[in-house]
């Protein structure tokens, strides 16, 4: 099949959406499908690089990394229409979605959309207020996605939200896959020791690992308040925060206010190639976010053999088994209690870590690619049946 993927976010950006798209692209090509990508360029020029079409753009000034195309990309759209894709798979609801919709209208291709982001998590920051903002969002999103044949939800959490919005399309839950081999590989002990030394982590310290983008919606400040409780009795526990983002400065200020300078370490952004080392350095993976839709870091941590202690959220369904490979919490005191009970229990850490690895096996990229390709075949078949039915009805009407 010919598959066109449209997205506002793509390489060189690094985030969960980009990871999902690149993994899908690789798996579809392995299956023999022809894949092309239409995205927003990282600068003000339009260009084509291999199978990727970049539409010139400018900074949005709305949110870091978000750019706005300022071209209708006529030549690129014309070329993609002439290519005649069987399926157009949009990955974002805003700028590139318009291109996707136009190409579907011009080609009759089947239209699939993956809903990656729970925007309602951000409505509390708008003047209208959370309740009114959510209602407006639901109405707008229902209209926006009206032309889509099937929506893919990465988790049950996302499916529930879309159903609350009143979406009428088929909604299929397909967890985003990760490359498990990358996290199965062992890292030399010498490399871990070197990293510990660089970060100022003693050999006897126990490490709580937080890894991901430092956005305000990630609620990392909650982990800091939890650490304030933990260090009252566990002075050898360190919180290692890996990643960069707009919340870093305020988090560093909070660390100083809570007098946690000796217990919290900011590693900054790290290259994708080095991420595995940080997972190996951690003893427990921690997360306070309730804005996740894919939970890729949960799966990466589990595949690396780490137990999970995370704020309770429906995104964790199937990834965190309470008491098996970790615990969920609903306040900082429960978080601190879970850490205190397990951080020095080597037997629990080992058993929970092994359980995490077993759970992660179901989230490989190969299975992800097969499930998505199955959706493509289904919507393409339905489209063909509907087209045939329409043609028959049209011919009958003409005879009359």
PLM region spans:
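N-terminal subdomain of nucleotide-sugar transferases
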Residues: 1-54, 367, 373, 377, ...
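Donor nucleotide-sugar binding/catalytic pocket of nucleotide-sugar-dependent glycosyltransferases
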Residues: 39, 53-56, 134, 139-192
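Short alpha-helical donor nucleotide-sugar binding micro-motif in glycosyltransferases
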Residues: 144-145, 269-270, 277-282
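Aromatic "clamp/platform" in nucleotide-sugar-dependent glycosyltransferases that forms part
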Residues: 290
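Short hydrophobic beta-strand element within catalytic cores of glycosyltransferases
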Residues: 307-310
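Conserved acidic donor-binding segment of nucleotide-sugar-dependent glycosyltransferases
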Residues: 322-333, 341-347
């Amino acid at each position: 099949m010919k598959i066109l993927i449209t997205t506002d976010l793509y390489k060189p950006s690094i985030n969960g959406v980009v990871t999902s798209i690149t993994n899908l692209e690789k798996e579809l090509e392995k299956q023999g499908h022809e894949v092309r990508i239409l995205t927003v360029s990282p600068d003000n020029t339009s260009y084509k690089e291999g199978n990727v079409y970049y539409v010139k753009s400018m900074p949005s000034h709305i949110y870091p990394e978000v750019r706005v195309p300022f071209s209708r990309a006529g030549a690129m759209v014309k070329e993609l229409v002439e290519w005649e894709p069987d399926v157009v798979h949009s990955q974002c609801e805003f700028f590139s979605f318009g291109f996707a919709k136009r190409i579907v209208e011009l080609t009759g291709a089947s239209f699939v959309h993956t809903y990656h982001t729970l925007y309602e998590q951000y409505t509390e920051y708008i003047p209208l207020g959370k309740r009114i903002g959510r209602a407006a969002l639901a109405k707008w999103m229902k209209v926006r996605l009206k032309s889509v044949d099937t929506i893919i939800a990465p988790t049950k959490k996302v499916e529930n939200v879309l159903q609350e919005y009143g979406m009428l399309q088929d909604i299929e839950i397909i967890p985003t896959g990760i490359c498990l081999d990358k996290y199965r590989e062992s890292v030399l002990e010498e490399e871990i020791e070197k990293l510990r030394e660089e970060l100022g982590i003693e050999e006897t310290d126990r490490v709580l690992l937080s890894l991901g983008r430092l956005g305000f919606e990630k609620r990392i400040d909650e982990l800091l308040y939890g650490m304030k409780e933990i260090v009252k009795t566990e002075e050898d526990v360190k919180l290692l925060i890996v990643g960069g983002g707009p919340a870093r400065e305020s988090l560093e200020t909070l660390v100083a206010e809570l007098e946690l300078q000796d217990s919290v370490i900011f590693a900054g952004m790290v290259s994708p190639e080095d991420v595995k080392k940080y997972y190996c350095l951690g003893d427990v993976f921690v997360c306070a976010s309730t804005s996740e839709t894919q939970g890729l870091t949960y799966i990466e941590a589990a595949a690396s053999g780490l137990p999970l202690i995370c704020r309770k959220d429906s995104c964790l369904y199937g990834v965190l088994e309470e008491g098996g490979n970790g615990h969920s919490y609903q306040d900082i005191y429960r978080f601190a209690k879970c850490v205190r009970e397990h951080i020095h229990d080597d037997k629990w850490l080992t058993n929970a870590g092994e359980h995490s690895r077993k759970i992660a096996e179901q989230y490989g990229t190969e299975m992800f690619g097969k499930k998505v390709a199955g959706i493509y075949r289904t919507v393409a078949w339905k489209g063909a049946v509907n087209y045939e039915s329409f043609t028959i009805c049209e011919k009958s009407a003409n005879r009359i």
